[in-house]
Amino acid sequence: MFQIRKILYLAIFLLPIFLQAKTVEVCDSCETKTIKEGIARATASDTVLIKKGKYNEFDIVIDKPLTLLGEDYPVIDGELKGGIIKVISDNVTVDGLFIINVGTSYTEDYAAVRVVKSKNFLIQNLVLEKLFFGIYLEKSRDGRVFHNKIIGDAVEEYNSGNGIQLWYSQNIDIENNIITHVRDGIYLEFANDCRIKNNISSDNLRYGLHFMFSNNDLYENNTFENNGAGVAVMFSKKIKMLNNTFKENWGTASYGLLLKEINDADIVGNIFKENTIGINIEGSNRIKYTKNNFIKNGWAIKVRGACYANIFSNNNFMYNSFDVSYNSKLNDNKFDQNYWSGYTGYDLDKNGVGDVPYRPVKLFSYIVNRTPETIILMRSLFIDMIDFSEKVSPVFTPDDLLDNFPLMKRQE
């Protein structure tokens, strides 16, 4: 009996060796000529190798664990008929494809690659053009979207989709992607425990990054440039935004970063350069803003209502038209140990900290918020005079909003 059991264990152990995965080749001159046929012939853990060429196919469904691999970037043309690749199995890899002409719909979110209720997937090395949605993850988890190039041709918001979208998904890595000319570059909704790193999202119609109801996420080393409305972060908690660049997001409703109803977050080491508003903050609490650079923005920071217990420290505010804008006389936030290029105080004891507190909120910023047309008076002698009078005896701006320890030198 023991010998029989031993033989059975050995057979089970050796079974994967005898049942090795195979490769199904797809090309015009191959036995298998279409991608759908290749997937149908494949078994679990096989590789479907798509040779270089053009394949006019859409509604390609991957319903088993396999690798869909392109050789020399074969073109899959959906001919504007609908979605192109749909993954409904765990343990799927899609790699090395050039996908074009996703269909447009007002009732369905057609995507170049859609992953539905799947886990342990890898979507990488894709080039996507002429698309509605690019990569759409729906109720999926434990996957990676890596090194893809997504180039849309969006003109209007109503008939365009997002580059990478996550909906009710968890534990996803989005890394090293380039997204441009879509509606929102990266969009997350109900997506928790995700990591978004080293992506470039630029020249999109609306937001470079837009997420809501998504908690415990990390955003690191991304660049968001020249997007219609910048970046919007809403109704989320426990997020980390580290070492990102937000630049050249200009417009009357455009921000480097919009925070709305965000709690318990860390915003550290980011660059906000040449935006209409560097950070616009609404209803957001207990956030640490440290070691950020605010350079040549219209407003570096706009603090609107219901923002409490936030800490701004060791940031550089350099050459912004307005450093801080506040719409209330009450202040529960701390602005200490920052560098301000507009600070004109002195440091007699040479300890690197100014001996006179700095008031970052100017009366003129208050006036411009109420009456935008007054911006034409900027840098006039009259404005200098009223700013000075408000500095001496605050009436309209919070009298306790001070940097008590302004730094004399920029933080590296």
Task: Describe the function of each predicted region.
Residues 3-13:
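Sec-dependent signal peptide recognition
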Residues 250-256, 268-269, 274, 287-291, ...:
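Functionally critical loop-and-helix segments that line ligand-binding/catalytic clefts
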Residues 78-85, 106-115, 130-137, 157-168, ...:
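Extracellular beta-strand/beta-solenoid scaffold signature
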Residues 23-57:
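Acidic Gly/Asp/Thr-rich repetitive segments characteristic of extracellular carbohydrate-active
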Residues 49, 61, 69, 77, ...:
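Extracellular beta-strand solenoid repeats
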Residues 12-21:
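Hydrophobic h-region of N-terminal signal peptides that target proteins for export
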Residues 55-67, 76-120, 132-140, 166:
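Extracellular beta-strand-rich solenoid/capping regions of secreted or surface-exposed proteins
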